Curated annotation (Swiss-Prot):
Protein name as catalogued: Presenilin-like protein At2g29900
Predominant localisation class: endoplasmic reticulum
Lumenal side: 39-76, 128-135, 180-188, 327-336
Membrane topology: Multi-pass membrane protein
Intracellular or extracellular location(s): Endoplasmic reticulum membrane; Golgi apparatus membrane
InterPro entries registered for this protein in UniProt: Peptidase_A22A, Preselin/SPP, Presenilin_C
Intramembrane segments: 367-387
Function: Probable subunit of the gamma-secretase complex, an endoprotease complex that catalyzes the intramembrane cleavage of integral membrane proteins such as Notch receptors.
Domain statement: The PAL motif is required for normal active site conformation.
Assembly, per entry: Homodimer. Probable component of the gamma-secretase complex, a complex composed of a presenilin homodimer, nicastrin, APH1 and PEN2.
Xref: SMART domains: PSN
Length: 397
């Protein structure tokens, strides 16, 4: 291999990496939009009966003024973000105290509740909507089995990666759909507040998510979390095999078992080629099943990063709030949905490019959410007026 060759960057395969992460994100958003269009075409009726911690400080009413709605939505967002911050710091404390088994049990129980409770509610609504004949006992048995399998698929690595990815996307769909039932003003202010929180939690030195990641790196442990990991990009070539090459600088002062790892890169190594110099090259398959050898083997709760296998990891919270944005837009019209979807995809692409430059965990919400919110209001205030005027004057129809 040519030693002067530039190390392979994620920019060289940005197209495949984008598809690997944009496909599940798009499926999640499309499913939420579909559920919104089927189940609650009238947002006012569904919002009034739905309450959660996101509406603890203020309950929006149609008779309230716009200023009152904004202030109330701001209070709701502060309460919600504060609750998330406290919960995340509790998670940091438990991880610091090495209560990993308890965290895994808690995450598994949470996944079971989401699949069983929220999933059951949505399935009941769909059954009622389409008049599907099924008895309650059969429904409960199927729902229980589906939820149990989902918990094991998400938190046990022996399952197929496609099954795990499918369950993660479905969990994101369930949570996102119920977030779309929040009042309109609360939804938009909450999305902006969560984007700002994501920046602080991931990038600030005292951010809870950054503390978790640094602690996991220092201990060489995984954080129990709901994280979507895309498959790594593997290129097939008739003459070469893609490998991860660990270059070790052998030192005469140390024995062979304590070599210092200098560079970790993906390269195409000829199968016949065997290096013979002071710098030894050990090639291993690109999909490495030994996470303890990787420097970036941590699991991110939110944000975007690179896993030990070279695959991109995206927190399930990002799936959820992307889908909340387009789901809320679907309550207005589909033209706004298209605009918000393109804005989110563009923001995610920008975030992936930043990831390729900085090579560390980055918040995935800010760029996409900000672009999505801006495009939503531009579509409602400008694009709709333009399209209506063009249609009424037969310029387009």
């Amino acid at each position: 291999m040519d030693r002067n060759q530039r190390p392979r960057s994620i920019l060289d395969s940005l197209g495949e990496e984008l598809i690997a992460i944009l496909t599940p994100v798009s499926i999640c958003m499309f499913t939420v939009v579909l559920l919104v269009c089927i189940l609650n075409s009238d947002p006012s009726s569904s919002s009034a009966s739905f309450s959660s911690i996101a509406t603890a400080a203020y309950s929006e009413s149609d008779s309230d003024s716009s200023w009152d709605k904004f202030v109330g939505a701001l209070l709701n967002s502060v309460v919600f973000v504060a609750a998330i911050t406290v919960a995340t710091f509790v998670l940091v404390l438990l991880f610091y105290l090495r209560c990993v088994k308890f965290l895994k049990f808690y995450m598994g129980f949470s996944a079971f509740i989401v699949l069983g409770n929220l999933g059951g509610e949505i399935l009941v609504l769909l059954i009622d909507r389409f008049r599907f004949p099924i008895d309650s006992i059969t429904f409960l048995i199927l729902l229980f089995n589906f939820s149990v399998v989902g918990v094991f698929a998400v938190f046990m690595s022996k399952f197929s990666i496609l099954i795990t990815q499918g369950y993660l996307v479905w969990i994101g769909v369930l949570v996102a759909y119920f977030f779309t039932l929040l009042p309109e003003w609360t939804t938009w202010v909450l999305l902006v507040a969560l984007a700002l929180y994501d920046i602080a939690a991931v990038l600030l030195p005292v951010g809870p998510l950054r503390l978790l990641v640094e602690m996991a790196i220092s201990r060489d442990e995984d954080i129990p979390a709901l994280v979507y990991e895309a498959r790594p990009v593997i290129r097939n070539d008739s003459r070469s095999v893609q490998r991860r090459v660990w270059r070790e600088q052998r030192s005469s002062q140390n024995n062979a078992n304590r070599n210092e790892v200098r560079v970790v890169e993906s390269a195409e190594v000829e199968e016949e080629h065997v290096g013979s110099s002071e710098r030894a090259e050990i090639s291993v398959p690109l999909i490495d099943r030994r996470p303890e050898q990787a420097e970036n083997s941590e699991t991110f709760l939110e944000g975007i990063g690179l896993g030990s296998s070279g695959a991109i990891k995206l927190g399930l919270g990002d799936f959820i709030f992307y889908s909340v944005l387009v789901g809320r837009a679907a309550m207005y019209d589909l033209m706004t949905v298209y605009a918000c979807y393109l804005a989110i995809i563009a923001g995610l692409g920008i975030t992936l490019m930043l990831l390729s430059v900085y090579q560390k965990a980055l918040p995935a919400l800010p760029v996409s959410i900000m672009l999505g919110v801006v495009f939503y209001f531009l579509a409602r205030l400008l694009l709709e007026v333009f399209v209506v005027q063009c249609s009424s004057n037969l310029v387009m129809f």
